[in-house]
Amino acid sequence: MADAFDPSDTRPDELAAVARQKLLVVLGQLQTYIFQVELLKRCDPQVARHQIGKLKLNALQVRAVSRHFMEGMSSQAATLITPLTLALELSLEYARREGEKLLEALNDLGERSSPVAYFEGTMGLARGCPHHQAVKLATYGGEIDKELCFLHDVENFLKQMNYCHLITPASAAAEALVSVKAFLARTVGSELIVPPEISDPSHPCHVCFEELCVTANQGATASRRLAGKICDHVTQQARVRLDADEMRRNLPHVVGLSEARRARALHALEVSSKMTEANSGGPAEAPGPAAAQEREASALLDAHHVFKSAPPGLYAVSELRFWLSSGDRTSGSTVDAFADNLSALAERERRYETGAVAVELAAFGRRGEHFDRTFGDRVASLDMVDALFVGGQSAAPDDQIEALVRACYNHHLSAPVLRQLAGSEHGDAEALRSALEGLHAAEDPPGDGNAEKEARRAPSLGGGPEDDWAALAARAAADVGARRRLYADRLTKRSLASLGRCVREQRGELEKMLRVSTYGEVLPTVFAAVCNGFAARTRFCELTARAGTVIDNRGNPDTFDTHRFMRASLMRHRVDPALLPGITHQFFELVNGPLFDHATHGFAQPPNTALYFSVENVGLLPHLKEELARFMMGKADSDWAISEFQKFYHFDGTSGITPTQRIA
């Protein structure tokens, strides 16, 4: 028999590791349950009714888990919370609220109830936008009222609290953090897909700023570089791959279907696929001049063999033919592998929906009234931009992005000159054409077809002045044409480079907006750091208030004389210059907020680095930065000792954040 697990025989770090593993297991089960709840909220309500028994059992289990963990997490929140415990608490609250709301909607559902009313209740379509949270923060300089609507609003507010932590009471900060936590419970608590209406990737976070601080700036300021930064930390992109044969591959493994129904569903899917493929043919593209040049080059090369001497031009043609054949001609552009345009994506979505309906009718005998079908008319009435945000079942977000890029290129490359230079093998094709012309010119005798060219090249010996002027005009026209062609090529290449650079820049924004985004770890980490900082201050105040002996000598008449004596004694002694760096670091450690802790990293940085990040992330105005820099400079004489008697840290008579921060 193995010995039972005894926590007293285990080291604290091992206990912490075991606790983290258990919390991660519970969090994973919660996320699975939340995912199933989100599916039931969107599927046919008559189908979801068959799962009401399992849903009730899971809802009771969520309540039991919440009752088991909440007491310990509440006591831990007063000391130290971690992003993991915060994520578990938010997920528990979200799972309990959404699961019970779904259960209530299913209980109210009748046999002939409208799916519209069910979806309006489960998806919250009948109520207003839930992503509006009022937050009030009371500081020593006044009250601040804000509204949280986006995820970056939460991060900005927490950074502002971190900067103003010196002028914010711990009790007021705790009240504000309760409102912030309620917003996080409705958003980050799901741990699933981020709604596009609450995410704005054009607002960089503090991690984006730190990344820019360790990369080359190329002479640009941090604010200018932040203006073009696309944040991928508050929300993170997820690459979604959709397989066209996914339904055919998974049908044989569906549980609860008889063999006859499964075979009938597979046959219906096969027939539907054949019908859609028969209607998706298109005319072949006519060959261009490049194909004719390749055929001519192939004919010349095939006519040559090892027993014939190869002219110099033929070797050049062979080399260019090698480069053209070794290139990736099938993927002239990446977008050819995806849908040609948005209409093709819509056609693909229609074919997928046709196959899905055929399978449902063959397997279940009815067409499911899912959320996207019930509100299909509303989705169809959306404009192109909103339809891109909604997405589809058969087209991945990357397909939409490639279709948009292809449409952009097709629009800008409609000019013949740009279209001629758009191919990656254009230079080789032009060189092949020139080599073929030179080869033909070398093979032709001087007296045949080249008589005209030689007559133009040779100087006019016996002709009249009219012939000289005609030859001069012809040479001038040829020179103008060559210059114009070279200028057009140069301008076209520059335009193509500008177009490619613009597409690359805009592609990053398209990917962040259209790709599936999940919640990152920035918001839980920032919330935990700020909350722990104010919780430490609260514990310090409580320990001070519970001191065994409190001597209150404020009414003693000798207190003022003692104060003057101590002040005079301190002013007579100069601080040793060798102690100034340590005192400066101690000052920064006291002034810094709880969010930035670069001084505690493995590769520790000076404490003033954290103050720099704190100031820059809140967008402090330049003149306030200059005031802060002057304050940090050493003060001469006794200016540092000027303060009112027995009022070391007070803000009487001050109002406003900036004056209060200046006094602090």
From Swiss-Prot:
GO terms for biological process: viral DNA genome packaging. A zinc finger (C3H1-type) spans 205-233. InterPro entries: UL28/UL56. Residues 281-292 have a biased composition (Low complexity). GO terms for molecular function: ATP binding; zinc ion binding. The keyword Metal-binding applies. Residues 273-295, 440-466 are annotated as: Disordered. Keywords: ATP-binding, Host nucleus, Late protein, Metal-binding, Nucleotide-binding, Viral genome packaging, Viral release from host cell, Zinc, Zinc-finger. Component of the molecular motor that translocates viral genomic DNA in empty capsid during DNA packaging. Forms a tripartite terminase complex together with TRM2 and TRM3 in the host cytoplasm. Once the complex reaches the host nucleus, it interacts with the capsid portal vertex. This portal forms a ring in which genomic DNA is translocated into the capsid. TRM1 carries an endonuclease activity that plays an important role for the cleavage of concatemeric viral DNA into unit length genomes. Associates with TRM2 and TRM3 to form the tripartite terminase complex. Interacts with portal protein. Belongs to the herpesviridae TRM1 protein family. This is Tripartite terminase subunit 1.
